[in-house]
Amino acid sequence: MTSRSVCEKMTMTTENPNQTVVSHFFLEGLRYTAKHSSLFFLLFLLIYSITVAGNLLILLTVGSDSHLSLPMYHFLGHLSFLDACLSTVTVPKVMAGLLTLDGKVISFEGCAVQLYCFHFLASTECFLYTVMAYDRYLAICQPLHYPVAMNRRMCAEMAGITWAIGATHAAIHTSLTFRLLYCGPCHIAYFFCDIPPVLKLACTDTTINELVMLASIGIVAAGCLILIVISYIFIVAAVLRIRTAQGRQRAFSPCTAQLTGVLLYYVPPVCIYLQPRSSEAGAGAPAVFYTIVTPMLNPFIYTLRNKEVKHALQRLLCSSFRESTAGSPPP
């Protein structure tokens, strides 16, 4: 069965006999030859396993170690949970499409759910990076005010607000996208349901959607990025005033990991969402990096340069090993 014949079964007739609407979509996915499908499946399985295991390990470490009680580690736990979920929204469906042609099919409702979940998690991560930058600004530039400003209650409230704003932001985009009429074709030239490739299939005017998407990038994403940049300008200025090189390195070390994460988060989406609507080539690589590779890299980025997290991981692994050894019967 070809993708064309599959797509023909994904439309249903409306009250108007001359008009059909799409009931399912066909995710064309990544471009690869059939003989390489098994290799790509194993590659994505490996990446997904590392992503989920790495992020859940960070989450478990932050939640169980009393030495990681600072707000920055509280927010790192939220980031790890977001990355594990973000990878879960996209990668399993990609892997299903690598196995069978039917694995590339997604229902209209399933597409809406995937789009909502992706933008909910990605938007929340965007706001979380801003909160993390503000946390570092207070810790370095306002150290005396920091314990009062970033107490446990404030951390919980700020994290909750980022999740609430992310959910609202995703709901707006999802409702605007799926209020449109989709009457064919049903081929999404992408590996998951995202706003630009889905809008290309709409049979009605998408001007409002495109304006809202550009406004979202201009106001939400750019606004968060500006706040992050301003925070780090003050941070760098404060770090440069520290007299010892060791003090400067200790103060700025957590910030370098955050800056790396911010760059990996912002650069690929800009390449995706700001390219012309008619352009499909070139979107795949940044999208794969943004949705699949970055969530895998974040645990390494935030642990390799952070001695506290590395020591906490060692304590957790050693404790787990001792418990498993003590529980095993003697030879």
From Swiss-Prot:
Specify the glycosylation sites in chain numbering: 18
* Membrane topology of this protein: Multi-pass membrane protein
From which domain of life does this come?
Eukaryota
Biological process GO terms, please?
A: detection of chemical stimulus involved in sensory perception of smell
Extracellular side stretches: 1-38, 89-113, 175-211, 273-283
Localization, UniProt: Cell membrane
Which Cys-Cys disulfides exist here? 111-203
Similarity remark: Belongs to the G-protein coupled receptor 1 family.
The protein depicted here goes by the name Olfactory receptor 10S1
Q: Which organism is it from?
A: Homo sapiens
